Amino acid sequence: MLGRAPSKTLQTEVVRTVFKADPKIVLAAVGPELNREPTLSRMPLDLEPVDGLHFEDLAGLFVSTPFNHGIVGMTIRQVAYIFGLTRRSGAKRAIEIGRWRGGTTVALAGAMGDGGKLWSIDVGEKEARVFHGRGLKFDEETREFLDRFGFDVELIVGDSRTLEVETGEVDLVLVDGDHTYEGVKIDVERWGRRVRVGGALLLDDAVDEPIFGSHAETAGRVMQELLDEGDFALRAQVDRLAHLERVR
């Protein structure tokens, strides 16, 4: 019935009204569509556990969707994978393309720990566009949090398509900026190829997400081109995130 409503605005208002009246009704309807069968036999272990189980190994215990995005716009499994991979690989030099509230910036810096160096690059327009200049300063909050723990992170505001930053070869690059085909392609060519052989290139929104959608038609297309060229090999897909290893 709702699918025949005359507009998305009306559909949204109907759902909002029902949710305010009785949230359990909405959860009962939506929950089964989002949750895989909740059994340990079906729990994903995205990272191979080493030295026992760590918290990032337990991310599969949770269901995470855009409904519970917070500071970071990724699922629990994605952030756990990024953190665990970075820490276990011993990565100490990383580049992040695309920064919003600072969630993955903190995750990467925390995983590298002492001696780590992160270059985080963002064009810096989203905050003003989304909040209409209401004075929210996410980069200031991110800087304060990073300084609290002594992390070495450069929060760079600039266009990743043209910006010149000397980083040298790095261990890991996370691309989560411009999601157009051209934008992802440029970011991969300019920054992703700085990954050393054996290092990790992480592409967010490269894997199709059937309910909420991703950018598989653009980021996924770039991923497939990289695999076809042979310089990178696919190592894992975690929700919308693709992990590629530089092999030559």
Identify the residue ranges that each predicted region occupies.
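Membrane-proximal basic amphipathic "stem/tether" segments
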Residues: 1-63, 248
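S-adenosylmethionine/decaboxylated-SAM
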Residues: 58-60, 65-248
